[in-house]
Amino acid sequence: MTARKSMAWLLLLILPAGFAGVWRLQRKVNVERDAMYQEQDEVLVRSPKLMKLLTLEYATLAADIYWTRAVQYYGNKHLGEETNLESLWPLLDVATTLDPNLLPAYRFGATFLSQPEPRGAGRPDLAVQLLERGLNANPTYWRLNQDLGNVYYLELKDYAKAGQTYLEGSKKPGAAPWMKVMAARFLEKGDSRETATILWSELLDSSTDEAIKETARINLELLRTDEDVDQINALAQRFVAKTGRPPTSIGEMAQAGLIGGEPVDPTGHPYVIGLDGKARVSSKSPLFKEKSVYRRPL
């Protein structure tokens, strides 16, 4: 019994010390493991020029290695739910410098860079830089215009640049017909009505696709209503200045000598004045429904 008590007391003294030792060992292992992962982020040469000199005729192979490393890096960070993607750009920079024709690196790399954290690096500026480099090296590849236009539209909210980028891509060999359609829509959203009108007119005259021709026709009619409504609203402001209140109808504006006749939309339906005193397409006009379809958010 005495021997058992002695053994129990001995275990009580030894076990805490043993657990403490195991804890310290595990902590050291964790620290070294984290340091190893951190080292993996930094292990490859970051200088594109230096890598170009080192690899010589093996540059294309080295580019594939760097691109593969970029994909693995992005995937591992997501699996570990980490948001620090600071090594992503250097990897893509080296890969596309070593092989300027590595198209997947431009396309998917731009997606990795442009998406907001935690899905991506939150660096649309670097995505633009990467895609512009790709376009310089691959000037006839219209898909890069599509990708660049998407970055301008989705991440930077620059609709005019998105439209111009899509328009440039639409002129390249093999470009999909919808590139010009999207260019026109982006330019409309960016208030570039004149350019959008030219594009829709070209599509109406040149396209052999009846669906595209119908889309072009309706959008041209909607653009005309935009111009008409703006002009009527400008006259409505003069009515307010003259009477101290907004107009309630087009007829009231005509009685005030501000407008002659009854302006109608391209389908022949008169415009109306809403409760807010502003002009709009009549709910009786076919364009009222078309506007809700063709002017939905992109």
Question: Which role fits each region the language model picked out?
Answer:
Residues T2-A110, S114, E290-Y294:
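N-terminal alpha-helical interaction modules that lie
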Residues L44-E57, A127-E132, A162-Y166, K213-E214:
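Repeat-mediated protein-protein interaction surfaces in helical alpha-solenoids
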Residues V71, G75-G80, A110-A121, G149-K157, ...:
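Short coil/turn linking the two alpha-helices of tandem helical-hairpin repeats
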Residues N84-S87, R119-L130, E155-T165, S192-T195:
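Structural signature of tandem alpha-helical TPR/SEL1-like repeats
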Residues V94-A95, R133-G134, Y166-G169, E202-S206:
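Canonical positions in the second alpha-helix
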Residues P100, P139, P173-G174, S207-T208:
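Short coil turns that delineate tetratricopeptide repeat
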Residues R107-F108, P124, W142-L148, A160, ...:
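Alpha-solenoid helical repeat scaffolds
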Residues Q115-E117, S192-S206, A211-L298:
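Low-complexity, acidic interaction segments enriched in glycine
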